[in-house]
Amino acid sequence: MVDSLWHGFADMGSVVANGRFVVARGEGTRIWDTNGNEYLDATAGLWFTNVGHGRTEVAQAVADQLTKVAHYSGFGDTTADITVELADRLGDIAPV
């Protein structure tokens, strides 16, 4: 695996010497590596898993949206209807 995947932020010398930390699954705030060891996912909220792993209602909402449109650029004066809907909902609850 070390030969086929070089992550841009990894210390590859350490990976070669000590092996790679590979996550196999997650549930809520916990993750498990490929050896079955369980960890608290302390970096879950870093980008996009701040709602936890394995949330079937989130997976279903994503699947539903992907059948409509996966992504549309917000550059210029274009956007997607779901983006407008989210902005309106956030505007309704944001303390501004």
Locate each region found by the language model:
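Glycine-rich loop-to-alpha-helix module at the N-terminal edge of alpha/beta enzyme cores
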Residues: 38-96
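Active-site-adjacent loop/helix segments that line or gate small-molecule/cofactor pockets in enzymes
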Residues: 1-27, 68-69, 77, 82-83
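Active-site and channel-lining beta-strand-loop segments
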Residues: 20-41
